[in-house]
Amino acid sequence: MTKRILVLEDGTVFEGKAFGADIDVTGEIVFNTGMTGYQESITDQSYNGQILTFTYPLVGNYGINRDDYESIIPTCKGVVVFEEARRASNWRNQMTLDEFLKAKKIPGISGIDTRALTKIIRKHGTMRATLTHVGDSMDHVTDQLQATVLPTDNIKQVSTKTSYPAPGVGLSVVLVDFGLKHSILRELSKRNCNVTVVPYSTTAEEILHLNPDGVMLSNGPGNPEDVPQALDMIRGVQGKIPIFGICMGHQLFAMANGAKTYKMKFGHRGFNHAVREIATGRVDFTSQNHGYAVSREDLPEHLIITHEEINDKSVEGVRHRYQPAFSVQYHPDAAPGPHDASYLFDEFIEMMEVFKQSN
């Protein structure tokens, strides 16, 4: 078994076993606390440019199947596990995790203390990291790593380049792709929506020309401040048609209305995050994947906080006080994770129907 090392920008080194693609990579190291759902996580474009650590000790035991892709071409930089299952056992299995990562040109490392690694990230925050082969001078690797500037065009990398339809017989929805998870599209299709997926750079005029009943702002990777043109688009459609934002879409919707965002120390990544609906006290367990959040202190008067994370009290949902528009930081589409919050898609459908009847 070939050895591979993980080097953090603070100089910490972990030595383990190589699997997946035989290449060196650099990215932001993060951790995911989910016990299952590794295929959905690896193929989630919100992990673009990141080295993904799984805290659950065994990963790969049910293999990779054709149904659980969140995107066809995953763009995470690398995968870190305590133990990689060399054999997969599941009736849907088509290939092992190792075979999948090789095919997608993603390196992995196993056999390291992922609990110790996670504690470092929790204490010091996410940071740059390198997956490389044994043999190079550690001082040289660390110097190179500390000099590395990570890309800021994450959304541009993963957004669709051209518009495409997902036909349905129901309400017409324009889905703006900032790094779209297929599960969002599936939830809209289950509700018979006639969906047009458009690039992140689509203007308000182009969206309104499609005459939709509503606009959905998808999830996506990176810093919401990197796509200022999206704020103009949101302001241009807001009030004219209903809006529903998820994850990155939530942050952009809030920013377009005057809110500010900040980078979290280590983010929320997993599907055991308890979120409280403030008006009712209802608690949902949610799937989350984000490193930025909306600032509670800078929220303008016309945005109402509707949901908050129980543990750190971060803003998990907002609604416009006067217009048909709302957003949530978490993933009501789950994939992976609980479906507690899938009712939000129904609320969006109802919002579009009411708006359509009144206009």
From Swiss-Prot:
Residues 172-358 form the Glutamine amidotransferase type-1 domain. The active site is at C247, H331, D333. L-glutamine binds at S46, G220, G222, M248, Q251, N289, G291, Y292. One of its GO terms (molecular function) is glutaminase activity. It comes from the Bacteria. It is an enzyme of class 6 (ligase). It catalyses: hydrogencarbonate + L-glutamine + 2 ATP + H2O = carbamoyl phosphate + L-glutamate + 2 ADP + phosphate + 2 H(+). Keywords: Amino-acid biosynthesis, Arginine biosynthesis, ATP-binding, Glutamine amidotransferase, Ligase, Nucleotide-binding, Pyrimidine biosynthesis. InterPro entries: Anth_synth/Amidotransfase, CarbamoylP_synth_ssu, CarbamoylP_synth_ssu_N, CarbP_synth_ssu_N_sf, Class_I_gatase-like, CPSase_GATase1, GATASE. Its EC number is 6.3.5.5. One of its GO terms (cellular component) is cytoplasm. Pfam families: CPSase_sm_chain, GATase. GO terms for biological process: 'de novo' pyrimidine nucleobase biosynthetic process; 'de novo' UMP biosynthetic process; glutamine metabolic process; L-arginine biosynthetic process. Pathway: Amino-acid biosynthesis; L-arginine biosynthesis; carbamoyl phosphate from bicarbonate: step 1/1; Pyrimidine metabolism; UMP biosynthesis via de novo pathway; (S)-dihydroorotate from bicarbonate: step 1/3. Residues 1-169 are annotated as: CPSase. SMART domains: CPSase_sm_chain. Belongs to the CarA family. Composed of two chains; the small (or glutamine) chain promotes the hydrolysis of glutamine to ammonia, which is used by the large (or ammonia) chain to synthesize carbamoyl phosphate. Tetramer of heterodimers (alpha,beta)4. Small subunit of the glutamine-dependent carbamoyl phosphate synthetase (CPSase). CPSase catalyzes the formation of carbamoyl phosphate from the ammonia moiety of glutamine, carbonate, and phosphate donated by ATP, constituting the first step of 2 biosynthetic pathways, one leading to arginine and/or urea and the other to pyrimidine nucleotides. The small subunit (glutamine amidotransferase) binds and cleaves glutamine to supply the large subunit with the substrate ammonia. This is Carbamoyl phosphate synthase small chain. The lineage of its organism: Bacteria, Bacillati, Bacillota, Bacilli, Lactobacillales.
